[in-house]
Amino acid sequence: MTTSYLTFLAVAVGPPLVALGVVRAARWDGDRARAAGVGILLALALSYTTPWDNYLIATGVWWYGEGTVVGRLWQMPIEEYLFVITQTLLTGLWVQALPLRPTAGFSPTRRDAVLGALAGVLVGCGGAVLLTVDATFYIGAIIAWAAPVLALQWAVGWRYLWRRRRVFAAAVLVPTLFLSAADRYAIADGIWILAGQYTTGITVLGLPIEEGAFFFVTNVFVSQGLILYAWVLARWR
């Protein structure tokens, strides 16, 4: 019997989310502005992901197993909205548990901003090319969708992110590996099914590369956002 989407979230995402919440509460330093960073990113994640997710579901890039969801809001199951929320919280709390140590004195140049934005544009161009072929449509949709956010974040502080690359790597890789493993189970169990028409068929340890790319990109969004947010706060103070 296929696991329900809600049960999957409760079992796979719930325990680490609660554990990170307990750690965050134990380390609470009263800095409301810093804590607000996760809330800001949560609102942005929902508003940016919802139309994209709905479009891909409507296109038939993936669908859900029979009886695995409790209801839908537009094309997306209610649980999908919960997944966006819980992933953002999970990664956000993880990032804030790391030693960010923002460097207030670091200042980017206009040239840095231009280079960062151009890099994001190049990513978008690559995604647009992949969108033209059915087999790479899903991976192209992920890359093209990621490009505007990456362009903005890199324009703001790609050089600062490079200086904090070790923390950034830990911030991204740990939740990406965890969520990819959980996603691998969900696909194997039939909670959601990817369309062969829109995917490459390439897998790593049974996980479609498109799904790994999605979790990598979204965790990059959250990690870069919070690292840059902490840096901007330090500069303002």
Curated annotation (Swiss-Prot):
InterPro entries: Lycopene_cyclase_dom. It is a multi-pass membrane protein. One of its GO terms (molecular function) is lycopene beta cyclase activity. Keywords: Carotenoid biosynthesis, Cell membrane, Isomerase, Membrane, Transmembrane, Transmembrane helix. Pfam families: Lycopene_cyc (PF18916). The chain crosses the membrane at residues 3-23, 38-58, 80-100, 113-133, 137-157, 170-192, 213-233. GO terms for cellular component: plasma membrane. It comes from the Archaea. It is found in: Cell membrane. GO terms for biological process: carotene biosynthetic process; carotenoid biosynthetic process; retinal metabolic process. Disruption phenotype: Strains lacking this gene show undetectable levels of bacteriorhodopsin, retinal, and beta-carotene and accumulation of lycopene to high levels. Catalyzes the cyclization of both ends of lycopene to form beta-carotene, a retinal precursor. Is required for bacteriorhodopsin biogenesis, a light-driven proton pump with a covalently bound retinal cofactor. This is Lycopene beta-cyclase.
